[in-house]
A protein has these predicted regions:
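Aromatic "clamp/platform" in nucleotide-sugar-dependent glycosyltransferases that forms part
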Residues: 287
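Short hydrophobic beta-strand element within catalytic cores of glycosyltransferases
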Residues: 304-307
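Short, small-residue-biased leader/transition segments that mark boundaries at the very start
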Residues: 1-4, 8-16
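A charged, aromatic-enriched C-terminal amphipathic alpha-helix characteristic of glycosyltransferases
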Residues: 342-372
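Carbohydrate-associated surface elements
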Residues: 165, 187
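Conserved acidic donor-binding segment of nucleotide-sugar-dependent glycosyltransferases
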Residues: 319-330, 338-342
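Conserved donor-binding/catalytic core segment of Leloir-type glycosyltransferases
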Residues: 160, 210-227, 233-236
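Short alpha-helical donor nucleotide-sugar binding micro-motif in glycosyltransferases
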Residues: 274-279
Length: 373
C-alpha cells in the first residue's frame, strides 16, 4: 500500500518516513503475515484475517490524511483486504487499485485461467487453488460476494491494469461493474537495465561458455508449475543436440541436465542486468502471467524474448524483440530459438523508451490529479 500526498510540482512526496527505510511504514512482521496466511488456509476467507495489522494501517491513513491511496499487491496476508477496501470507500478517500493479479475481482484466484465464473458469479468453485482452498470448505463465493458489495457505488475508485489483457477481464467482471478501468503498463529503471556487453563477456567466460554457443536464460523467483519450469526442462532436453547453453536464475533447485546450469538467487539488479546482457534469448515458460517484468528488463538490455502467448505476455514483446508462441508448445519455442536474430538497436531504443519507469510515474501522476481536482 502506497500512501502519498498530492504534489504540485510534478513529483510525488511521501509524508511518512521511518529511519530504517524512507517512504515505508511496516504494519506487521513476516511471521505475523505467515500466521495469518495459515489461518486463512484453515477456515477463513482468502486475505480476510490480519485484524491487528489492518487497524494499524487504517490508523496510519487517519494520521497521514492522504489525498490518494494507491493499493498494490494486497495478497501478502498483511492486511484484511475487505476491511481496508470498505474503510476507504466509507471514508471517501480517492483510491487507485492496480491489478497485478486477478484476485481483486474473483473469489480469491490470482489467475482464473480458463474459468469464467468471475464474469457472472464465483460460485461452486472447483479450482481450489492455494488462495481459495481451506480445511473447512471453499470460501470463494463468500469472498466474491464481499468484494462485489464493497465495489458497488464506489465512485472514488479507479482500477488500473498493468496489461490490456487484465484490464479487459476486470472491466468484464461482474464484481467491478460500473468501476472505470484503465491501463498503465509497469515500468523499469532503464538506468540499471541497459546493454552491458563487456560485463556480459566476462560472465560468459566465468561460466565456461564457448564462443559461438547461444545462451538461453530462464529467470523466475521460484521454479514453480505456474512459471513453467517443467516446460523449460523439456525445452532444454529437446535441445540437447543443439549448440545451446541453458541458464536458470532465481531458485536454488538443482538439475543434472548437461546443457543446463542453475545459478540460484541473483543478488542485485545490476547482476541481473549483466545476466540478461549475457543471454542471447530470454525464454518465458509461464502458464499464466499478467505482465512479466523480466520481459521488460531483458528487452531493455537488448535481449529478445520468446514466451508463451498467455495473459499479457504478448504485450511485453515489442516488434523486433522476440516472439510469442502458442501456449505450452515447446516444439515451437525450440524452432524459434534456432532462428531468432539479435534485435536492431532501434528496437532496443524503442523498448527502453516504452518501459521507462518515469513514463509509468507520469501516467500515475496524471491519474492522481484527475482524481483530486
Amino acid at each position: 500500500t502506497e500512501i502519498y500526498t498530492r504534489s504540485l510540482v510534478g513529483s510525488v512526496r511521501c509524508v511518512y518516513e521511518t529511519a530504517e527505510e524512507p517512504f515505508t511504514c511496516q504494519v506487521c512482521s513476516d511471521r505475523y503475515g505467515r500466521a495469518q496466511g495459515l489461518a486463512a488456509r484453515i477456515g477463513g476467507l482468502p486475505y480476510g484475517h490480519c485484524a491487528w495489522a489492518t487497524r494499524r494501517l487504517i490508523g496510519q491513513i487517519h494520521r497521514i490524511r492522504p489525498d490518494v491511496v494507491h493499493l498494490q499487491c494486497l495478497n501478502g496476508h498483511f492486511c484484511n483486504l475487505y476491511h481496508l477496501l470498505a474503510f476507504l470507500k466509507e471514508a471517501q478517500i480517492p483510491t487507485v487499485l492496480t491489478l497485478h493479479a486477478e484476485f481483486p475481482y474473483t473469489g480469491g484466484c490470482s489467475h482464473a485461467g480458463t474459468c469464467s465464473g468471475f464474469l457472472q458469479r464465483c460460485t461452486g468453485c472447483t479450482r481450489a487453488g492455494p488462495e481459495t482452498a481451506c480445511l473447512l470448505g471453499n470460501r470463494a463465493e463468500a469472498s466474491w460476494q464481499q468484494l462485489r458489495a464493497i465495489y458497488k457505488g464506489w465512485d472514488r475508485l479507479a482500477v488500473v491494469g498493468c496489461s490490456r489483457w487484465i484490464a479487459r477481464r476486470a472491466a468484464a467482471s461482474s464484481a467491478l461493474a460500473g468501476i472505470p478501468v484503465s491501463v498503465i503498463p509497469n515500468g523499469i529503471d532503464t538506468g540499471v537495465f541497459f546493454p552491458r556487453p563487456q560485463d556480459a563477456s566476462q560472465l560468459r567466460q566465468s561460466l565456461s561458455i564457448a564462443p559461438g554457443k547461444r545462451v538461453i536464460l530462464f529467470a523466475a523467483p521460484a521454479f514453480t508449475h505456474g512459471k513453467g519450469f517443467d516446460l523449460f526442462l523439456d525445452l532444454a532436453r529437446s535441445c540437447a543436440h543443439l549448440p545451446l547453453r541453458f541458464l536458470a536464475a532465481g531458485d536454488h533447485t538443482r538439475h543434472s541436465l548437461p546443457n543446463l546450469t542453475t545459478l540460484g538467487h541473483i543478488s542485485g539488479r545490476e547482476q541481473m542486468a549483466v545476466l540478461y546482457s549475457a543471454a542471447d534469448v530470454l525464454v518465458l515458460c509461464s502458464r499464466q502471467d499478467n505482465f512479466p517484468t523480466v520481459c521488460l528488463e531483458a528487452s531493455a538490455c537488448g535481449t529478445p524474448v520468446v514466451g508463451f502467448s498467455v495473459g499479457g505476455v504478448p504485450e511485453t514483446i515489442l516488434p523486433g524483440l522476440g516472439v510469442a508462441v502458442p501456449p505450452g508448445n515447446v516444439t515451437a519455442m525450440r524452432r524459434v530459438l534456432q532462428t531468432l536474430l539479435p534485435p536492431a538497436p532501434a528496437a532496443v531504443a524503442q523498448a527502453r523508451a516504452r518501459w521507462d519507469c518515469r513514463r509509468m510515474a507520469l501516467d500515475y501522476l496524471a491519474l492522481y490529479r484527475r482524481m483530486t481536482p
